[in-house]
A protein has these predicted regions:
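Catalytic binding pocket for nucleotide-activated donors in carbohydrate/polymer assembly enzymes
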Residues: 147, 277-350
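Short loop/turn segments at strand-loop or loop-helix junctions that form parts
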Residues: 22-26, 81-83, 105-107, 156, ...
Length: 372
């Protein structure tokens, strides 16, 4: 998922930088469907082209193989979007020991995954690790072997668009015969994870039935995590997975959206999800949100200290009855007792105290480091 839009645009406007997006395959070692990986690459390419950004695909079409980026350009600065060894070794941080490296995390780290988010070899090697707030920096200091010496608090650039008063979101919603409430259903990919057990496999068909039941008053966007489809193909097979996704795209009041979410968030009325990063990001728009979690599981033990604050701003749902209640009472009837808590959370944790946007802070820090 592309989260560095604001940084890229800020660099484009800066005389010292000429940014490129590098597009290459990920999750290549997880036995995912190869055709789906290729389709993901093509969607990514179209997405970046649609933004008008310069990009590089380090692929030799004559030899049919991926090649070293350094054989095409010699980058002075590399921003990584993932800390994991999920692609070819020539795209790992080890290959850029002679290049200044930076990292903007995928999203607001809300889950209790401290070692994974702050103490991989990657986190200890990267030149600058930009984090959203002081809580995340303290987790890095406590967790990382380098004591978080490369960690800098800037806010998260992926969310600064929500702070801009001049941004006009595009309407991506399917036209309806009359105005309806707009609800996003965004399931995560942890369908078989014992530590973060998803409800998706239990309720996936019933959520479609809910969409049918509320069709006169609500329209839905199915916005799954991009990895969910890979895992469903492994579990269900390609035919059943494609049929399920197609069902979401063909009903009168439903649609499938695979790319981007900013405009969806800004034009929606509510979110149903179980995604770690969305736990905080949706709170920027101030709309009601319900988190899907299994009954009997203490989710507060699965969030870090910051994530607990985010999670406490959510309604909770463990079955379709509670989802329906959320839709009827909160979304349709406007009974929203969590609204004051969400507003206070925004003031306390999300609103920049100095008024400076994260991308501007990131470039300021980068300039200071480069110029000594």
């Amino acid at each position: 998922m592309w989260k560095d839009d604001a940084v890229f645009k800020t660099m484009q406007q800066h005389p010292h930088y000429h940014p490129f997006v590098v597009i290459y395959p990920y999750d290549i070692y997880k036995n995912y469907d190869k055709s789906e990986i290729q389709q993901t690459l093509e969607r990514t390419k179209r997405f970046i082209e649609g933004k008008g950004y310069e990009y590089i695909i380090p692929y030799d079409s004559e030899r049919h193989q991926w090649v070293d980026l350094k054989s095409i350009i010699k980058p002075d600065v590399v921003f990584f979007t993932s800390p994991y060894k999920d692609s070819y070794p020539m795209y790992y941080i080890y290959h850029y020991r002679d290049t200044f490296t930076c990292y903007v995390p995928y999203g607001y780290s809300a889950l209790e995954l401290s070692s994974l988010n702050y103490d991989l070899i990657f986190h200890n090697l990267v030149g600058l690790h930009f984090v959203p707030n002081e809580m995340h920096k303290q987790i890095s200091i406590r967790t990382a072997r380098n004591k978080g010496i490369n960690t800098v608090v800037t806010g998260h650039p992926a969310t600064e668009v929500f702070l801009r008063k001049d941004y006009i979101p595009q309407n991506q919603w399917k036209p309806q015969s009359k105005p309806k409430k707009r609800v996003i259903f965004a399931p995560h990919h942890t369908i078989n994870d014992p530590d973060y057990p998803s409800l998706f496999l239990d309720i996936c068909d019933e959520v479609l039935e809910i969409a049918e039941q509320f069709k006169d008053e609500v329209q839905f966007v199915f916005k799954p995590h991009q990895v969910l489809k890979f895992k469903l193909i492994q579990q269900w097979g390609k035919e059943k997975t494609e049929a399920y996704y197609q069902k979401w795209d063909e009903m009168e009041n439903t649609q499938l959206v695979s790319d981007g979410y900013v405009d969806l968030f800004l034009t929606s009325d509510a979110l149903i999800h179980d995604c770690g990063s969305f736990t905080t990001e949706y709170l920027f728009v101030g709309k009601p949100v319900i988190y899907l979690c299994r009954k009997g599981i203490d989710m507060t033990k699965r969030f870090n200290e910051f994530g607990i604050h985010s999670f406490e701003c959510h309604y909770k749902g463990s079955n379709v009855t509670e989802i329906k209640r959320f839709l009827q009472e909160v979304v349709l009837e406007g009974k929203d007792p969590m609204q004051p808590k969400r507003e206070q959370f925004f003031e306390d944790y999300l609103k920049p105290k100095d008024g400076i946007l994260p991308s501007q802070k990131i470039l300021k820090v980068l300039e200071e480091v480069i110029n000594g």
